[in-house]
Swiss-Prot record:
Any GO molecular function: ubiquitin protein ligase activity
Induction: Up-regulated by synaptic activity.
Every NHR domain range: 61-217, 292-447
Pathway: Protein modification; protein ubiquitination
Upper classification of the organism: Eukaryota, Metazoa, Chordata, Craniata, Vertebrata
UniProt PTM comment: Myristoylation is a determinant of membrane targeting.
Positions annotated as zinc finger (RING-type): 520-560
Enzyme Commission number, as recorded: 2.3.2.27
Protein name, as recorded: E3 ubiquitin-protein ligase NEURL1
Cellular component per GO, a single term: perinuclear region of cytoplasm
Membrane-protein topology: Peripheral membrane protein
Native species: Mus musculus (Mouse)
Assembly and interaction partners: Interacts with CPEB3 (via N-terminal domain); the interaction increases CPEB3 ubiquitination. Interacts with DLL1.
Function statement: Plays a role in hippocampal-dependent synaptic plasticity, learning and memory. Involved in the formation of spines and functional synaptic contacts by modulating the translational activity of the cytoplasmic polyadenylation element-binding protein CPEB3. Promotes ubiquitination of CPEB3, and hence induces CPEB3-dependent mRNA translation activation of glutamate receptor GRIA1 and GRIA2. Can function as an E3 ubiquitin-protein ligase to activate monoubiquitination of JAG1 (in vitro), thereby regulating the Notch pathway.
Compartment annotation: Cytoplasm, Perinuclear region; Cell membrane; Perikaryon; Cell projection, Dendrite
Amino acid sequence: MGNNFSSVSSLQRGNPSRASRGHPQNLKDSIGGSFPVPSHRCHHKQKHCPPTLSGGGLPATPLLFHPHTKGSQILMDLSHKAVKRQASFCNAITFSNRPVLIYEQVRLKITKKQCCWSGALRLGFTSKDPSRIHPDSLPKYACPDLVSQSGFWAKALPEEFANEGNIIAFWVDKKGRVFYRINESAAMLFFSGVRTVDPLWALVDVYGLTRGVQLLDSELVLPDCLRPRSFTALRRPSLRCEADEARLSVSLCDLNVPGADGDDGAPPAGCPIPQNSLNSQHSRALPAQLDGDLRFHALRAGAHVRILDEQTVARLEHGRDERALVFTSRPVRVAETIFIKVTRSGGGRAGALSFGVTTCDPGTLRPADLPFSPEALVDRKEFWAVCRVPGPLHSGDILGLVVNADGELHLSHNGAAAGMQLCVDASQPLWMLFSLHGAITQVRILGSTIMTERGGPSLPCSPASTPTSPSALGIRLSDPLLSTCGSGPLGGSAGGTAPNSPVSLPESPVTPGLGQWSDECTICYEHAVDTVIYTCGHMCLCYSCGLRLKKALHACCPICRRPIKDIIKTYRSS
């Protein structure tokens, strides 16, 4: 019995003679990791206990991103300090290149934000050596896919903190609690339950609206200085009642809960949609790459309309039925698709959104110049074309609008084509405008992309592909508009008149051969007039332009504004 006891004792405590020389015995498992030991042994500072502050400082090796184990969408710079997600919203899991110390702050700077997605960074730790993880085995999401596996702990950063330029620091203490702070704010409890008896690598998922991050020099935080705020004192969107279970965040970090700023809509309380599913729906409605240079113009009509978030968000502060008109900061380009997301609607009710284009530079207008109703814009002398999105809209819906080289404004709704809505003059600079109605109280510009058509986008100044037509709301075709290209006596006949009346042109049907202007289509100025508009009888269009105009919603004659019921092609005798 004595021999057996001695054998067991030496196995648990290590050889006394070797211990006296500072060489405690290490036991390795099959992959080279230390065996876990009972928690009451950790105060003896055996080598398999995690590194702590008692070492006196940070390791000589700087904290970098692991060069090989990363998601398929991650692009990493040569210094291994900065990563960027190149497309989509997921497949962007990264790890640190070495284990972190207890109380070592992993410091990240957000370098790129893409507002078309929901959710933000997922931060945490893993006891699995990233060098032993094959990159192809990484799931799309840290939450819930990765944290559902043993040895991974992570949670979503509240979206309100995921702004470009913010510095996020997070760390784990000896009790397995994870804290974080934003910039120089107080420390806040993030989650708990991390197993600290094993080495821990940092885990960063560059998810959702966070597109790029940079690792800064890590720092040690002194336990005596930690006075974390209660998590309930923080205004954050991902608050949940947490138990002591290690991976409580498995099912909770993936819920789409509305942020305090309301930038992203959410379904009614009690019916949350997982952010992963929401983003998957959005990915079907959006291209892989979006340009982010398009903004809302500072001009807005409405006492309670605000332009927020670097002029990408237009918000109506009160739900009353009042004017809420906003414009793009620059003219849209031919074949440029503009993506707009409805990010807030009141009470889950459906709402409406008007949209259109104008040749009027918003910089030349004052809010007092704009009418209460967007439909009344047609009384102005500039070209205005306005209509409403067909069908109801809800929070989270994504609209795509594009003016093609033929002057047709097409609409898509959540990736599904809704057809041509307007026919406009693509030869002139066109600013896009939006008006919020009813329950729709906030929209966001997600970005834009150029869709090449038939070999590439056409030049916006080419008269050969410049249809000029009325809008779906019976817009008045003003005299300056008809003289856009300065060709023919038609433009000169009404030269500088202020077109507050529908037209100042002859209202009788025009027969071919009665003047030079009657030989050219008043839309394309290229083909000969060969079409009669029924029922008014005017002849001012070629057949191809007449067909396009007839397809427009509430199509009307460019001369007398009567509804177009049909078009009839005519043939001249030689």
